């Protein structure tokens, strides 16, 4: 269906495809892999600095969802009723951190951005929401390695 849509068959509406796939997944007792194209949980998620920066620029500066969807993704998220997701990880830039905070209604401070950014650089994974929220309230200098160890041990 997605390929037909991308080839120009515009009478195909893809907004219900995810829900349909979830239903089939539950009936067949076969989970959809997180990295599955178009319908997997991570299909429109990125934490990579350059890719995320381009999407952020399209969404913030140009206010252009079309550009973010059609140029930076093989399948447009909006056609599936979804949106691009920017996460924070070891290869993220500071723009990922700022965008992530702003998307959640948090006005980022330089200190918050720096703490989260430095923590992410030492992590070996994409940060979870719990990890980022735990870092948001930190006010003083810190040892990112010690915090990383502490947060991952309690998770």
PLM region spans:
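A mid-to-C-terminal "edge-of-domain" accessory segment
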Residues: 9-155
